[in-house]
Amino acid sequence: MITVFVACLFQCVSSLPAKLYIKTTLAEGIGKLQTVIGIDNDIVFAYERLYGDLTLRNHTAVGETLFDLAGSLEEGKNSTVDRFLGHVVIREFHRLHAGLQYVSVQNFSVSELVCFVNNNTQLSGSYVFLARNTTYVQIDLFNENRSFVHDLINVSSFLQNRSLHVLSFYARRFCVEDILNFYGKVVFGDSKYRPPQVFSKRDTGLLVCTARRYRPIGTNIQWSLHNQTVSDDHTTDDFIRTEISGQLLYSYERALSRALSMTHREFSCEITHKLLVTPALLTREDAFSFKGFVNPVKESEDTFPRHNFPAPHRKKFNKLQLLWIFIVIPIAAGCMFLYILTRYIQFFVSGGSSSNPNRVLKRRRGNDEVPMVIMEVEYCNYEAENHDMELHSVQNVRDDSIAVVCGNNSFDIERQSIKSHESFSNVKLEMLPL
């Protein structure tokens, strides 16, 4: 039991630094924005109260969304609220782009939600887009003062305050999820961007390519076959919620499905991202691809430039270590406990006397190489019955001597003299089992 307690204590202590680091980092990043977050929460709560008038059936008509959010959402009482909030956020993105059509001929891939850590180690998020095909406009979603938006655009015509509030609420939580890597690694710096985690799998006759922490703008994911773009059979976009340290963080996950056949084994899943790097505001295209069957685990993280943030490494136990901690060590500790308890009971049941036959046998076994047979003589006055047979059975066990116990006294006699010994001629000898 002590071993189990020590193992559990070691496991808790080993993971404590990483947990403290995550909570401290979140507290610092969110604490600096606490006032603004309170305002945005009021806006979002107002949207949640309107949910009774907006059912899932008329979301497409009201929200004008192109995304299908009917995928696998987190189960729980707040899943419907998350689903609705996802529709609201995507609708406001579309509302922004609808207004941008008046000043820009570009599509979604020239706009970007940029998350980064500035020189003061403060979390920042900006919405950057190309206006009139010549000018980049950057909107700081963490700053309530919008007066610095570029003069070339009449912002009031399409950038409504409600949209900016909702996008600010989303961006703040998305950027925390985007920058804080729960394994102790942060990607920012020159690129200020962490690419989505991409993996593929087979699923009931389909090849599914999934981009986790996917951004709905600035990124394009598609199937490719022999360097040619291939349309997908089905696309699913999920609005994912993560809760840590009491804060809700949001991100997207997009999945492409393609019917699988023997002739289409060369399918690859490609992601292209047109990154608008701030403050230089230079367009740079980062692209990568991987085969669907080669290594379907997070290949994107090894493709884009990455920067490591000094953070404690959280120890992870492998299956063998978990087997020892939760199965082998508890069983061994339990067996040891039962053994000690049994010996303890035997000692007190036997009375602890050195003249006890069992204790005599233990001493003799420890000193003699040949096992000793204990012969108990009850009261030393019984008449022997079938005396020769008793002695014959003794001779089969030991060749030189036997142990005789009479009352509180024990002694050894030679087998050769036992027949002629007068004091034992009228004694019944009973063999005790070893």
From Swiss-Prot:
It is found in: Host endoplasmic reticulum membrane; Host lysosome membrane. It is a single-pass membrane protein. Residues 1-15 form the signal peptide. Its main location: host cell. The chain crosses the membrane at residues 322-342. One of its GO terms (biological process) is symbiont-mediated suppression of host innate immune response. GO terms for cellular component: host cell endoplasmic reticulum membrane; host cell lysosomal membrane; membrane. InterPro entries: Ig-like_dom_sf (IPR036179), Ig-like_fold (IPR013783), Ig_C1-set (IPR003597). Keywords: Glycoprotein, Host endoplasmic reticulum, Host lysosome, Host membrane, Host-virus interaction, Inhibition of host innate immune response by virus, Membrane, Signal, Transmembrane, Transmembrane helix, Viral immunoevasion. Plays a role in the down-regulation of the host stress-induced NKG2D ligand UBPL1, which enables immune cells expressing the NKG2D receptor to recognize and annihilate infected cells prior to viral spread. This is Glycoprotein U20. The gene is U20.
